[in-house]
């Protein structure tokens, strides 16, 4: 993650649909992740390179979180009344783990920082090769690198969620949702997260103005999103506007979310589990913020 004095930078992908809740298959998926990490260790050791297993820790749910992701209006309203969509609230409540969860630190970071540029390049090439081999052995999937793995995962999610755009009831509810928001008619998967995305982009515009020097260029097909690093008092007015937008979005989507979210939840979780990841724990951050630079 690239942290500047003003902002942190994030890549934004095109899909913003389908947040997930914790399904029974998560335990099996987590076991696959553990197996995959063990094989990476063995492969790197065979090549004479260091690697410490680094599975993501099991996800800890916040009170009301699963209900929100399943489209529960009361839980959504309680969250949005304080945090909005969770964008500016991260600045206003810097010590609140609801919007600033503790980040998993990769145990390999210290070792990687000690490598020269040439050694790091060699290590990353070997790691991608070992990762791809482990994915094939554990998941039966063919990938060429970790980036390719994540790209395939996101593509699989988008493809699987597209069935919801053919759901006549969701299309009808989505039409009313869009009309209430004052936006052009859109597919259900495009409506889920639409208002949230607007706030993310607005925050990015504010943060970009504070960027020192030449801003980073986005890889092809992605957009660079700047994350603000404002003090709570400076971020508060932005959060107030975000809360207003989030509550309006919920009022407009009061029929849409309870119908759409449970289906999107099940689909997204299933795909993530197929890729050896806890459905909810891994899918939640990926919907809006795709890959940290």
Located regions from the model:
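Secretory targeting and sorting signals
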Residues: 1-21
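Cell-envelope/extracellular polymer assembly enzymes that use nucleotide-activated donors
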Residues: 17-293
């Amino acid at each position: 993650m690239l942290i500047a004095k003003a902002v942190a930078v994030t890549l934004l992908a095109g899909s913003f649909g389908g947040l997930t809740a914790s399904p029974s298959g998560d335990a099996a998926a987590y076991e696959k992740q553990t197996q995959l990490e063990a094989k990476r260790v063995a492969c790197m050791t065979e090549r004479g390179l260091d690697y410490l297993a680094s599975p993501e820790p099991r996800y800890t749910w916040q009170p009301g979180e699963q209900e929100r992701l399943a489209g529960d209006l009361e839980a959504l309203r309680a969250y949005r009344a304080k945090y909005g969509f969770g964008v500016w609230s991260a600045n206003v409540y810097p010590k609140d783990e609801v919007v600033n969860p503790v980040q998993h630190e990769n145990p390999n970071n210290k070792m990687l920082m000690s490598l020269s540029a040439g050694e790091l390049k060699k290590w990353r090439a070997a790691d991608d090769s070992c990762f791809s081999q482990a994915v094939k052995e554990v998941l039966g999937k063919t990938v060429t690198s970790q980036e390719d793995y994540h790209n395939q995962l996101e593509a699989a999610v988008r493809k699987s969620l597209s069935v919801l755009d053919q759901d006549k009831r969701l299309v009808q509810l989505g039409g009313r949702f869009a009309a209430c928001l004052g936006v052009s008619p859109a597919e259900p998967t495009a409506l889920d997260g639409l208002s949230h995305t607007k706030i993310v982009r607005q925050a990015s515009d504010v943060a970009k103005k504070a960027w020192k020097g030449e801003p980073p260029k986005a890889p092809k097909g992605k957009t660079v999103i700047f994350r603000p690093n404002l003090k709570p008092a400076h971020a508060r007015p932005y959060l107030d506007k975000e809360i207003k937008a989030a509550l309006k979005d919920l009022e407009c989507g009061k029929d849409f979310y309870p119908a759409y979210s449970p289906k999107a939840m099940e689909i997204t979780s299933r795909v993530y589990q197929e890729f050896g990841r806890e459905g909810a724990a891994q899918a939640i951050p990926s919907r809006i913020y795709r890959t940290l630079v």
